[in-house]
Swiss-Prot record:
Coiled-coil residues: none
Gene3D superfamilies: MFS general substrate transporter like domains
PANTHER family, alphabetized: PTHR23517:SF1, RESISTANCE PROTEIN MDTM, PUTATIVE-RELATED-RELATED
Record has Ribosomal protein as a keyword: no
UniProt keyword annotations, A-Z: Cell inner membrane, Cell membrane, Membrane, Transmembrane, Transmembrane helix, Transport
Molecular function in Gene Ontology: transmembrane transporter activity
Protein name from the UniProt record: Uncharacterized MFS-type transporter YfcJ
A Pfam family recorded for this sequence: MFS_1
Mode of membrane association: Multi-pass membrane protein
GO CC annotation, single: plasma membrane
């Protein structure tokens, strides 16, 4: 390839990467818009307990983790673009299930069941979307810029959470759950149309090691990622109820604060994992996350809680790409999609387990206790990361 063609190819790939990331933003609004609303809908409108709130939120992540293997194989064997577009379509179907839950004149258990069906479909769609877009982006710009690909995808995801949380509460309070569901149904279809003309990358060929051998290569960074994920899971599941229990307003803006600092860190410092390696960046990030969660635990006012959420977002921001760089180093190219899917599955498991367990903890010890549990998990994550990579 000539120097001229390289100069034209790199901007073209970067523009395609931007289009993919923007489509992720649109699609992930199906997660961001309902995230602060579902706890209120389940607890206040349907009359269920904190544990059921945790199940309603967390079950999506179990669906995601159970389909990560399929998503990775699909991306590796049949192409990442197919996986990504399939995920966008599935996320739109989740909105349709929630629309039925809102409009059908049925009992609370049936509405809850439809809500759960939508969450399961969303989990399936999310696994296809994120595994597909990460593998697609790596195919466009190359593994040496894996940190950039993960950073851009993360900015899209948490930008959607930052924008979606207050917007979701606004739509719900003014127009109801049906309007929220309809919005989440339309946005992924717009993303699908936006990405339709982005060039696909070829599926990888070559000998494929078994799934368990891939897991054996990635479990150390995966465990660190899982322990980080507890903090976001408790914020996403219980922050709305925490604010309501204290008589505070602005609950939706906690996710805006979290997502805003998350995106800002990716913009300003997303290059660090590629430059300095993942382990150092991950340890510092986990320290910042711990500080934010402790602030949420002790917050005497809504404003202090917002600062805690912002600090937590800043801490969580670089952990996925930081430890993800270590994953890409450890696996052959033909199973990169499977490896990234498996790596992300550790976070999905963390999200899925945290919701119900934190619900039991909140009922027994109060809502602040879940943020203390998140901080303890982050500290354990620091120890695990240091011990796991001390020879690396």
């Amino acid at each position: 390839m000539t120097a001229v063609s390289q100069k034209t190819t790199i901007p073209s790939a970067n523009f395609s990467l931007f289009r993919i990331a923007f489509a992720v933003f649109l699609t992930y609004m199906t997660v961001g818009l309902p995230l602060p609303v579902i706890p209120l809908f389940v607890h206040h409108e349907l009359g269920y307990s904190n544990t059921m709130v945790g199940i309603a939120v967390g079950i999506q992540f179990f669906a995601t983790v159970l389909t990560r293997g399929y998503a990775g194989r699909l991306a590796d064997q049949y192409g990442a673009k197919r996986s990504a577009l399939q995920g966008m379509f599935a996320c739109g179907l989740a909105g349709a299930a929630w629309l039925l839950a809102a409009l059908l004149p049925v009992s609370a258990p049936v509405k809850f069941a439809l809500l759960i069906v939508g969450r399961l479909i969303l989990g399936f769609g999310e696994s296809q979307l994120l595994t597909g877009t990460l593998t697609w982006g790596l195919g466009l710009v190359g593994p040496t810029r894996s940190g950039k690909v993960m950073s851009w995808n993360g900015m899209a995801i948490y930008g959607a959470l930052a924008a979606g949380a207050p917007l979701g509460l606004l739509i719900h309070s003014h127009f109801g759950f049906a309007a929220l569901a309809g919005t989440t149904m339309v946005l992924p279809l717009l993303a699908w149309a936006f990405n339709g003309t982005v060039r696909k990358v070829p599926a990888y060929t070559g000998e494929r090691p078994s799934l368990w051998s891939v897991v054996g290569l990635i479990w150390k960074p995966g465990l660190g990622l899982a322990l980080q994920g507890v903090g976001f899971a408790v914020i996403g599941t219980f922050i709305s109820l925490y604010f309501v229990s204290n008589g505070w307003t602005m609950a939706g803006f906690t996710l805006t604060a979290f997502g805003g600092t998350f995106v800002l860190m990716r913009i300003l410092f997303g290059w660090m994992p590629d430059r300095f390696g993942g382990v150092k960046v991950a340890v510092v990030s986990l320290l910042v996350e711990t500080a934010g969660l402790l602030l949420l635990w002790l917050a005497p006012t809504a404003w202090i809680a917002l600062v805690g959420a912002a600090l937590t977002g800043a801490g969580c921001s670089l952990i996925f790409p930081a430890l993800g760089v270590e994953v890409v180093k450890r696996v052959p190219s033909q199973v990169r999609g499977t490896a990234l899917g498996g790596y992300a599955a550790f976070q999905d498991i963390s999200y899925g387990v945290t919701g119900p367990l934190a619900g039991v903890l909140a009922t027994s010890c109060g809502y602040p206790s879940v943020f203390l549990a998140g901080a303890i998990s982050a500290v354990v994550g620091i120890l695990v990361t240091i011990l796991s990579f001390r020879r690396g």
